[in-house]
């Protein structure tokens, strides 16, 4: 008798996973990684100190392309002047320029925030000679912390005889004078057009309309 056929193994009834869209999977994974990285970066990035905020304000002053991470010599001098690091006695403009040239790299034209702090340490020794090194640095930092560039150079009006002649209505003569009232306000059309005076009085007569008052006063 022939051997009975062995029963076939039961098929795996677990349905196979349907293949997903690879592009969607990659996008989801990328978003997950970016969100995790953003969270870690936000937690790792400390808040700027008041000194570094002042550094960045002066670093970008007058330069729309500046990032605030490096400072030019001109802005360094302005910071020292506006924040009164330069007192004209212990620290002068020359001292500030010398320190900047000493701290920056030979082929560089700017200084970083770390170099900025080194430069302040150099100036602190001169600015506060009667204090210890640490106290002097703290005093210099207090002069700068929270400060911003002082905006100056506002154009002022310059009075000159020529300008005054052209703008002061009280000095106008002839037909130009008739276009403005005593307050300097323009009369409009009345100041440009010769209107016929039909009052019966001679032009320029100053007592027009006073006859009736005189007659009534004499009675």
Curated annotation (Swiss-Prot):
<keyword id="KW-0539">Nucleus</keyword>
<dbReference type="GO" id="GO:0031643">
    <property type="term" value="P:positive regulation of myelination"/>
</dbReference>
<keyword id="KW-0597">Phosphoprotein</keyword>
<feature type="modified residue" description="Phosphoserine; by CDK1">
    <location>
        <position position="45"/>
    </location>
</feature>
<feature type="modified residue" description="Phosphoserine; by ROCK1">
    <location>
        <position position="32"/>
    </location>
</feature>
<comment type="function">
    <text>Regulator of microtubule dynamics that plays a key role in myelination by promoting elongation of the myelin sheath. Acts as a microtubule nucleation factor in oligodendrocytes: specifically localizes to the postsynaptic Golgi apparatus region, also named Golgi outpost, and promotes microtubule nucleation, an important step for elongation of the myelin sheath. Required for both uniform polarized growth of distal microtubules as well as directing the branching of proximal processes. Shows magnesium-dependent GTPase activity; the role of the GTPase activity is unclear.</text>
</comment>
<keyword id="KW-0333">Golgi apparatus</keyword>
<feature type="binding site">
    <location>
        <position position="61"/>
    </location>
    <ligand>
        <name>Zn(2+)</name>
    </ligand>
</feature>
<dbReference type="GO" id="GO:0048471">
    <property type="term" value="C:perinuclear region of cytoplasm"/>
</dbReference>
<dbReference type="GO" id="GO:0005737">
    <property type="term" value="C:cytoplasm"/>
</dbReference>
<feature type="region of interest" description="Mediates interaction with LIMK1">
    <location>
        <begin position="1"/>
        <end position="116"/>
    </location>
</feature>
<feature type="modified residue" description="Phosphoserine; by ROCK1">
    <location>
        <position position="159"/>
    </location>
</feature>
<keyword id="KW-0378">Hydrolase</keyword>
<dbReference type="GO" id="GO:0005739">
    <property type="term" value="C:mitochondrion"/>
</dbReference>
<keyword id="KW-0460">Magnesium</keyword>
<feature type="binding site">
    <location>
        <position position="83"/>
    </location>
    <ligand>
        <name>Zn(2+)</name>
    </ligand>
</feature>
<keyword id="KW-0963">Cytoplasm</keyword>
<feature type="compositionally biased region" description="Basic and acidic residues">
    <location>
        <begin position="22"/>
        <end position="33"/>
    </location>
</feature>
<keyword id="KW-0132">Cell division</keyword>
<keyword id="KW-0325">Glycoprotein</keyword>
<feature type="modified residue" description="Phosphoserine; by CDK1, CDK5 and MAPK1">
    <location>
        <position position="18"/>
    </location>
</feature>
<dbReference type="GO" id="GO:0005874">
    <property type="term" value="C:microtubule"/>
</dbReference>
<feature type="region of interest" description="Disordered">
    <location>
        <begin position="171"/>
        <end position="192"/>
    </location>
</feature>
<feature type="binding site">
    <location>
        <position position="80"/>
    </location>
    <ligand>
        <name>Zn(2+)</name>
    </ligand>
</feature>
<feature type="compositionally biased region" description="Basic and acidic residues">
    <location>
        <begin position="175"/>
        <end position="184"/>
    </location>
</feature>
<keyword id="KW-0131">Cell cycle</keyword>
<dbReference type="GO" id="GO:0014003">
    <property type="term" value="P:oligodendrocyte development"/>
</dbReference>
<keyword id="KW-0206">Cytoskeleton</keyword>
<feature type="glycosylation site" description="O-linked (GlcNAc) serine">
    <location>
        <position position="152"/>
    </location>
</feature>
<dbReference type="GO" id="GO:0005634">
    <property type="term" value="C:nucleus"/>
</dbReference>
<comment type="similarity">
    <text>Belongs to the TPPP family.</text>
</comment>
<dbReference type="GO" id="GO:0003924">
    <property type="term" value="F:GTPase activity"/>
</dbReference>
<keyword id="KW-0862">Zinc</keyword>
<dbReference type="Pfam" id="PF05517">
    <property type="entry name" value="p25-alpha"/>
</dbReference>
<feature type="modified residue" description="Phosphoserine; by CDK1, CDK5 and MAPK1">
    <location>
        <position position="160"/>
    </location>
</feature>
<dbReference type="GO" id="GO:0150051">
    <property type="term" value="C:postsynaptic Golgi apparatus"/>
</dbReference>
<dbReference type="GO" id="GO:0072686">
    <property type="term" value="C:mitotic spindle"/>
</dbReference>
<dbReference type="GO" id="GO:0051418">
    <property type="term" value="P:microtubule nucleation by microtubule organizing center"/>
</dbReference>
<comment type="subunit">
    <text>Homodimer. Binds tubulin; binding is inhibited by GTP. Interacts with MAPK1. Interacts with GAPDH; the interaction is direct. Interacts with LIMK1 (via the PDZ domain); the interaction is direct. Interacts with LIMK2. Interacts with HDAC6; thereby inhibiting the tubulin deacetylase activity of HDAC6. Interacts with aggregated SNCA; may have a pro-aggregatory role in synucleinopathies. Interacts with DYNLL1. Interacts (via C-terminus) with S100A2, S100A6 and S100B; these interactions inhibit TPPP dimerization.</text>
</comment>
<dbReference type="GO" id="GO:0032288">
    <property type="term" value="P:myelin assembly"/>
</dbReference>
<dbReference type="GO" id="GO:1904428">
    <property type="term" value="P:negative regulation of tubulin deacetylation"/>
</dbReference>
<feature type="modified residue" description="Phosphoserine">
    <location>
        <position position="35"/>
    </location>
</feature>
């Amino acid at each position: 008798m022939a051997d009975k056929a062995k029963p076939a193994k039961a098929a795996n009834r677990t349905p196979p996973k349907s293949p997903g869209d690879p592009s969607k999977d990659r996008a989801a994974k990328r978003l997950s990684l970016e969100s995790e990285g953003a969270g870690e970066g936000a937690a790792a990035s400390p808040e700027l100190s008041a000194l570094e905020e002042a550094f960045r304000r002066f670093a970008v002053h007058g330069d729309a392309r500046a990032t605030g991470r490096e400072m030019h010599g001109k802005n360094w001098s302005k910071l020292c002047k506006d924040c009164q690091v330069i007192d004209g006695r212990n620290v002068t403009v020359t001292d500030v320029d010398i320190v900047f040239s000493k701290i920056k790299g030979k082929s560089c034209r700017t200084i970083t925030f770390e170099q900025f702090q080194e430069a302040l340490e150099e100036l602190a020794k001169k600015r506060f000679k009667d204090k210890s090194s640490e106290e002097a640095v703290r005093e210099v930092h207090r002069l700068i912390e929270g400060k911003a560039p002082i905006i100056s150079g506002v154009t002022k009006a310059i009075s000159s005889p020529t300008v005054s002649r052209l703008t002061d209505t009280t000095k106008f003569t002839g037909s130009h004078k008739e276009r403005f009232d005593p307050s300097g306000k323009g009369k409009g059309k009345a100041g440009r057009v010769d209107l016929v005076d039909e009052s019966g009085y001679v032009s320029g007569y100053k007592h027009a309309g006073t006859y009736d008052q005189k007659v009534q006063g004499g009675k």
